[in-house]
Amino acid sequence: MSSAVPPSHAIILAGGRGTRFWPRSRTRSPKQLLNIVGQKTMLEQTYERLTPLFPGSHIWVVTHREQARAVSRQLRQVPSRHILTEPVGRNTAAAIGLAAVHLLKQERGQDALMAVLPADHFIGKPARYRRIVRAALKAAAQPGALVVLGIPPTRPETGYGYIERARHDKPRQSADRDRAYAIRRFAEKPSLELARKYVASGRYLWNAGMFFWRVSTFLENLERYLPKTHAALMRIAERIGTSRYAAALQREYSHLENISIDYALLEPASRDPKHARVFVIPAAIDWSDVGSWAAVYELLAKRPGANVSTGRALALDAAGNLISSPSKFVAAVGVSNLVIVETSDALLVCSRERAQDVGRVVKWLEQHRLQKLL
């Protein structure tokens, strides 16, 4: 990194379950640990995007303890003490907080910068992405700054949250490449009609879940807006590096508030300019959150209506299907717009437009205690 910014660390959030990618995504091998798009896993791709920016000693991963061994196998370059395990999932505020207190204690990193990044997103323009990450870290080095990357919308999407830039900000000029804009507000996932208005206004961006700030700035705001979680994390911090750490983590972590960093900190901070400065940098990086099998189809299809297959498959008089068949031969005849995914013990068949509902299958399996399929 440039000498103009403090030491910077990448925090990869890799603790999700990926239930919408059942039956391939399971508790011990969730979406981020699978090669769903490309030959390498989502986690490996994320790590490789970051290595030109951060040395291995400055990359951290937060994951569930059941996934820690698989993470270690995939990222052998990352020091084992940098793979932070959650005893139970408590959403992104807790996960980021755990990383922050480890930086504070292990690296004496109160002034260090954190780049918080999901493990399971697709980015089609990695060079531009790295340039924007550098700009975001530079902006985050300013006192009190909380910086978010926003994706310029390419369609009226109802599945993402939106970020509205402040009205007084002028449209970005070529000389202002990668500039940070003040945020007016964070908007919930909208209706289709409202999403169309957002896109037409030119002021709204998709919230991509990528965040940048100083450790000290984050912890100050966490104490202000989520004081109980902050206090519990500081109790955990006191035990880092001691024989009592595991017990403290187990005891305290399950009591942390189960809330996203957006709701917990960023949204209230954007309404509180007296205490915080919240900014967004537009990032046209060919991004997808790869949120369902339908998103995988969109990324892999070479043209509208094409069939996409991984593994051994045949499509006859068929169109728009995604077939994932790593072991069995699958033939699809006279069908359209389906997702077909087989594993050794399960088969999923659903329409592409209902791919978001695959998570309901996992809920049903949980209710019926079919643990072998989870």
Which residues fall in each region the model found?
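Residues that recognize and position ribonucleotide moieties
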Residues: 115, 211, 289
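Residue-level signal for inorganic ion chemistry
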Residues: 43, 99, 120, 163, ...
